[in-house]
Amino acid sequence: MLFRSLQPALEEFQPAKSVSLNEDELVIARNYFLLTMKPTIYAANVNEAALSATSDSEQLRAIREVAASEGAECIVICAQLEADLVGLDAEEQREYLESLGVKSSGVDQLIKSAYRMLGLMSFLTAGEKEVRAWTIPQGSRAQDAAGAIHSDIARGFIRAEIVSYDDLIGARTYATAREKGLLRLEGKDYIMQEGDIVNFRFNV
């Protein structure tokens, strides 16, 4: 039954996800792990001139139309530019992108798009020697986020001291952020937000 439903679309080179399936067929389809049932991100590799152009080329418009027809995102990326950025520090990267009229690198956009598609987000922990990003599902509680670091932190969870990335960058130091009341204490059921910087208080 499933493959009879899918056959006409596949013979026309249309993705399996374009076919409207009932609940029973969807359950069966998941067992086959069909590639064209999976969500898609289109990445269009262009040159630097096209990246900073005020209008899309005919080819790029066609890719965007295909992506839109599938409800997918289209990320425009310049592989040569990304290779050049690797050898630059953060400030040089920012200046280079600004000179091209580009807000963020294609790789950054691709990562963010993948996170959105997979329902993921990240939070940060920051110490004197290390800043680290942790990946968790969107909608995770603070205690679940603590468990992403270590099960003992989740088990002995007391409070989470949190400041947003933007607030800390604006304040420049933890001390200033604390003076301005930007740091806050949250309980285990706090829903984590993208870019939260967290210090977990725990006892085991």
Residue ranges and their predicted role:
Residues 21-28:
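Phosphate-interacting basic helix/loop segments used at nucleotide- and nucleic-acid interfaces
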Residues 1-2:
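Short, small-residue-biased leader/transition segments that mark boundaries at the very start
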Residues 79, 87, 130-199:
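Nucleotide-binding motor/catalytic cores of P-loop/tubulin-like NTPases across gene-expression machines
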